[in-house]
A protein has these predicted regions:
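Conserved binding-pocket/active-site segment within a compact domain
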Residues: 98-198
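Short linear motifs in intrinsically disordered/low-complexity regions
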Residues: 5, 147, 180-183, 209-213
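OB-fold ssDNA-binding interfaces and closely related basic DNA-contact patches used
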Residues: 1-119, 169-175, 180-187
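Interfaces that engage single-stranded nucleic acids at replication/repair/recombination sites
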Residues: 191-217
Length: 217
């Protein structure tokens, strides 16, 4: 199998610039990895990462819900469009329904699976620390693929960790750590298709069923 690793290295650079199945959500909150609606703490657990299915792009929020998106797979060499190409540029309208925050946010998603149980989870992030962790993982994956391991094990097996640093104004800042502890062969399961992009919408109400159509959501 031949894999072009250039796309993964390109996306790693983008991440450093600061710029569907019913899968359980994995979240990193203030130094704690939390799984699912019950927010079970899973620091130190191990997962195989489907870096080859890394998904990223712009997600549009309204009143705490996804209302539009421009997403693509890294493996397809997808690069997010520039922010000014997405519309919603009038900051005065951001206050209504979005608390003054830009409704369009860059977000990245990494599918993970348990090698024993087969459980699938999805880690999504739009933070600087999360982007740095994913950038490092994409680079390590590209290096591994370029080395052409004879056993075909190109997916990183990671342990969920955490670190922190002291910010002069904001105090202690927690950042996620994805430590590579092993490598695994990719399963034969086909990659989920992407949803079709929706036409531009005004800053009005959320679309009820849009979030359910996003892969892994």
């Amino acid at each position: 199998m031949t894999i072009d690793t250039t796309a993964f290295r390109d996306m790693a650079a983008v991440l450093r610039q600061r710029s569907g199945a019913n899968v359980t959500k994995l979240a990193y909150v203030k130094g704690k990895w939390k799984l699912g609606r019950d927010k079970i703490e899973v620091n130190g657990t191990q997962w195989a990462a489907r870096v080859d299915w890394t998904l990223g792009g712009w997600v549009r929020w309204f009143d705490g819900r996804i209302t539009d998106y421009r997403l693509g797979y890294v493996a397809d060499r997808y690069m997010p469009p520039k922010r000014d190409e997405l519309g919603d540029l009038d900051e005065e309208k951001w206050e209504w329904g979005n608390y003054g925050r830009d409704p369009w946010q860059l977000a990245w998603s990494l599918p993970l699976f348990n090698q024993v149980s087969g459980e699938e989870v999805l880690y999504s992030t739009d933070t600087m620390g999360g982007k740095d962790a994913l950038a490092a993982l994409l680079t390590a994956y590209a290096d591994r693929v370029d080395s052409s391991p004879a056993d075909g094990k190109i997916l990183p097996v990671i342990e969920l960790g955490t670190s922190s640093y002291r910010h002069p104004q904001r105090g202690e800042i927690h950042v996620p750590v994805l430590d590579i502890i092993d490598w695994a062969a990719p399963p034969t399961k086909p990659r989920p298709p992407l949803p079709k992009a929706e036409p531009q919408k005004a800053l009005s109400g959320p679309k009820d069923d849009l979030a359910d159509s996003i892969p892994f959501n």
